[in-house]
Amino acid sequence: NGEKVTAQAVNGFVPIERKWRKGDKVELNLPMEVRYSKAIDKVEADRNRICITRGPIVFCAEEVDNAHDVATYFVSDSNMGATTMGAFSSGVMSGIPYIKQGCSALTGDEAATSTLTLVPYYAWNNRGDYAAMNVWFARDKATAIAGRDKVAKLPVKTKNFANKVATAKAGQQRKYHDGQ
């Protein structure tokens, strides 16, 4: 009801004791800091990689928002915490939060200082771009180079490419074929 109350959690709950009246409101301020979660080593493809979360929300990088191929970005320990947050102000993404993350990006085999724009995973591919997306980011240059050079084969099911396979290699255009 417009009054600030400081409360302590007890066994995972925050009790609010008061005499309740019709129309009372409880407004919660739950700060959600950006966190970096390390992949478990059992997942070989994600070794030495992190994902970026805020509260329960996983964020990802889309090609449409970033200057480099999203597979070439890496977030070293020194970049962790170098973030700003905002929200899109127009279009289909209006009101959707984003994170700007300090990082590096590969340009050839060299690393350049860069900024990564991340959107909530639930909101990716909503701009009709069918572009690349990444959730797991390398923690160093060597891991980024190794990941960039791997080829991914993904099944593609669209009206134009039914039962085709998309072969993608970082830095190259996608090629569609019958999987042969």
Model-derived segments and spans:
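Short aromatic-glycine motifs in intrinsically disordered, low-complexity regions
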Residues: G12-V14
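C-terminal beta-rich recognition modules with glycine/proline-rich loops and embedded aromatic residues
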Residues: E3-V5, A9, R18-R21, K25-G179
